[in-house]
Amino acid sequence: EITVLGTVFKKKFLTDNNIKFNEEQKYYSDPEFWTKVLMNVKNYGCNKDSIYVKRYHNDKINLPSISQMEDDRKDAHFVQSFLDCMKLSESKNDIRNHFEKMACDYYVKVFSRKFHDNSADKESIDFALMSSMVKECGKKTISKYGFVEKKILKNATDYNMEKVKKWSNIRLIKRKLVMMF
């Protein structure tokens, strides 16, 4: 048996299905691993009496964890991981829909807020990359969002940065007004 990401797997299951981490992907390699597991697992069990011990370290200088590392290519790794998972989950709509929702949520809640912080050069590079991820999402997923969020996502699929900025600012103003009253 092998422990991966806090879960015990039979080694035979992982080797028979050729499930392993993508060594070339420094960040976000676990979603691809889990997608492969979900595509191949037939049944699973749970032992509620188990104890999981995790070592937590917070040394940003000598031994930083991956989440503490600063890297300009994290967005590129995120998009690549998303695209790999979408390819793997083509035959299972529930998994694919989950990834589409995660991508849209990330774009609306995290990425669209970056327009207030970054320089113009960085924005245009990240914008094309992140918008290509949203373009992979289905219209059914996008239709589940509110009016302003739909506008942000629709303009992202059209690669219209100015309109995404406009609607992101409207969303931000709307949220701030709600918090004030």
Label each region the model flagged.
Residues H116-F181:
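Membrane-interface aromatic/basic loop that binds lipid-linked glycans or pyrophosphate carriers
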Residues E1-E70:
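Conserved nucleotide-sugar donor-binding catalytic segment
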Residues F33, V41, C46-N47, I61-M69, ...:
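Gram-positive cell-envelope targeting signals
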Residues K92-M102:
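Structural motif
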Residues E100-R113:
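Amphipathic alpha-helical repeat scaffolds of TPR domains
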Residues D49-N58, P64-D94, V110, D117-T141:
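Catalytic core of nucleotide-sugar-dependent glycosyltransferases
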